[in-house]
Amino acid sequence: DVEVELGVDFFANREELEKSADKVVFTGMIDQYFDYKHGELEYRSLRFEHEVLDEENYQGNAVVNYTEREIPYTRIIEHKHFEYGTQPKTVITREYPADWKRGDEPYYPINDEKNNAMFAKYQEEATKNDKVIFCGRLADYKYYDMHVVIERALEVVEKEFTK
């Protein structure tokens, strides 16, 4: 049996959780797992602004990306288009890039030379721990598109369960 617990602070319950299973899947920040012993990896974060508009359609698509330097946000999401909604109003969300600091949501790793070298040290630590499966964008310190996430999950399952 596989037990899944959601909404649990791993670090507040770490000892209990690690004792509760033969293997633990850790998808959080790898540097945090190792108590930042090699330094703090850097991320980019995001900030969101939501707005209800008194119109049926704002942009005609669920997601429109903006790459122009003069436009401060990187995309607008019009939620009703994910479900082909026909409501008389619409809700949009503007996504803005933001600097990351500890405690913020880490969205994108900053894969420069310094961070990659630091991550390699954490990765080496992770290989010494056969009780924990490190995977996911934060544990792998890598941005993943959805199809790659699925591929990575299948690789981890194959490695862990076909021994």
Predicted regions and their residues:
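C-terminal segments that line or cap access tunnels to active or ligand-binding sites in enzymes
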Residues: 21, 33-163
